[in-house]
């Protein structure tokens, strides 16, 4: 097998096949078969994610795999972003379909068609739905197992809210969930970026992406969170009856109201009025101005009485976010070494393998190994490999290859000392503990976790370099580094960088770092923000 230290790309291509993660002998490009070991690990990952999503109010649902084109095309920006990637179903049996179907590339349109039917009033909000499924995109670039494919296993979540503020609060919760997955489960070296305008989700207002940095210095997008605003709510007519008729627009500081004929007016009121209104209770009398009319309002009930001529129905605010098999593949790529995979222990199908070292008294060793297995099998996913046709050396090689996090060696010495020898997969560190100290296994897992997190943190710090000139940028990219550079935020400059260096402007920090005192790394014009630039998958 190719060594990761010598050729990480080729190592990855080999290891996901040799370690029983996937088999791509299936004759459709970009659609591999997930073997039981690999699929179990992915399911454990999705289970952890689903539990976290439910902790922030999300509920599971299932939507059809096909979407009528008439529904899919309702949001114009969305269709422009995906139309070239979709798989079409134009016939059913011998009949040509009048309304062609597509295999879902993502589920916004099919979900929102139904959300419009489910939501009536503010009491129905928030609505938060997740679905672990497969999506299909006709990927024309070269495919790469788990990283770039045509059938994508993933989890997507969609949320619907009363206001922009509520939507943004939910995005912050979604980010916490994803940070748990990327950091506490997968130990990935990653950064959050806000995508530039030209690279945000089709049909969205803002896109925040988690970009992991792979061993070869390339970015791998492992998750995204989108503020959709009202861009889907309007074409899909997702409205709700609110307890007041005032509303905001994305990117506009003003507050508006509409009469029942659709005429729109700006509303002027004290800041305190808006603050109390959002809490659902007014504690004093306020004067508000709508167009050339003034109203005195002292309660929510008075809003309903005095503002009957206005429309209390509003468009919802929405978010969507997703994690795919890419995060799983990225973790395998990042954590592995020359010996094989290093499986993150929270998703490892086998967390601990017990290997009896047979010799003078095989019966004692086997019986003791079974005893150890019984003591720990209810707490961990444990496999006792008592196959006497294979040597311990072969077993060490195999379980290193598939990345089992901990190995327990049991020979006659361990039997006599009432102990076990534990070997960590990531760094080969050995521990000898008494059978009365099995709680120390938790400590070993925790120590392993902290070491892997520190490794990821150090890697990000080493990989990201600040540059100010194009020559410095070029040098950083040639050295497979990630550059942080001042940038004018023009798409034309980003395109030139991509053409010349085969690197992409990924975006700013979530809270953009101001670069107004600097010059754009490409064109030399005044810069706006510091951005991350690097090669990508």
From Swiss-Prot:
GO cellular component, one term: cytoplasm
Domain of life: Archaea
This protein's record includes keyword GTP-binding: no
Self-association and partners: Homodimer.
One GO BP annotation of this record: prolyl-tRNA aminoacylation
Principal location class: cytoplasm
Keyword Aminoacyl-tRNA synthetase attached: yes
Keyword terms, alphabetized: Aminoacyl-tRNA synthetase, ATP-binding, Cytoplasm, Ligase, Nucleotide-binding, Protein biosynthesis
Gene that specifies this protein: proS
Origin species: Nanoarchaeum equitans (strain Kin4-M)
InterPro entries recorded: aa-tRNA-synt_IIb, aa-tRNA-synth_II, aa-tRNA-synth_II/BPL/LPL, Anticodon-bd, Anticodon-bd_dom_sf, Pro-tRNA-ligase_IIa, Pro-tRNA-ligase_IIa_arc-type, Pro-tRNA_ligase_II_C
Reaction catalysis annotation: tRNA(Pro) + L-proline + ATP = L-prolyl-tRNA(Pro) + AMP + diphosphate
Designated name of the protein: Proline--tRNA ligase
Cited function: Catalyzes the attachment of proline to tRNA(Pro) in a two-step reaction: proline is first activated by ATP to form Pro-AMP and then transferred to the acceptor end of tRNA(Pro).
Transmembrane regions listed in the UniProt entry: none
UniProt-listed Gene3D superfamilies: Anticodon-binding domain (3.40.50.800), Bira Bifunctional Protein, Domain 2 (3.30.930.10), C-terminal domain of ProRS (3.30.110.30)
Family of this protein: Belongs to the class-II aminoacyl-tRNA synthetase family. ProS type 3 subfamily.
Record CDD domains: ProRS_anticodon_zinc
